[in-house]
Amino acid sequence: MRYTACTESGQNQCICEGNDVCGQGRNCQFDSSGKKCVEGEGTRKPQNEGQHDFDPIPEEYLS
């Protein structure tokens, strides 16, 4: 399963597969047609991955 890597601080930045970063209040979403930046929640991680809903963004994307 593929999923977004979102901040938990409300910045609404996601890294799609590869180095695509969604900004401007958009999130990444994966579906049968591939990846895209969309308004809203984006694609969530599987719930059995632990207490965090989203993966953190790597430090190099936050500067």
UniProtKB/Swiss-Prot annotation:
Keywords: Disulfide bond, Glycoprotein, Protease inhibitor, Secreted, Serine protease inhibitor, Sulfation. Residues 53-63 are annotated as: Interaction with fibrinogen-binding exosite of thrombin. This is Hirudin-P6. Residues 1-3 are annotated as: Interaction with thrombin active site. GO terms for molecular function: serine-type endopeptidase inhibitor activity. Transmembrane segments: none annotated. Glycans are attached at residue 43. It comes from Hirudinaria manillensis (Asian medical leech). The modification Sulfotyrosine is found at residue 61. Its main location: secreted. Belongs to the protease inhibitor I14 (hirudin) family. Residues 35-55 have a biased composition (Basic and acidic residues).
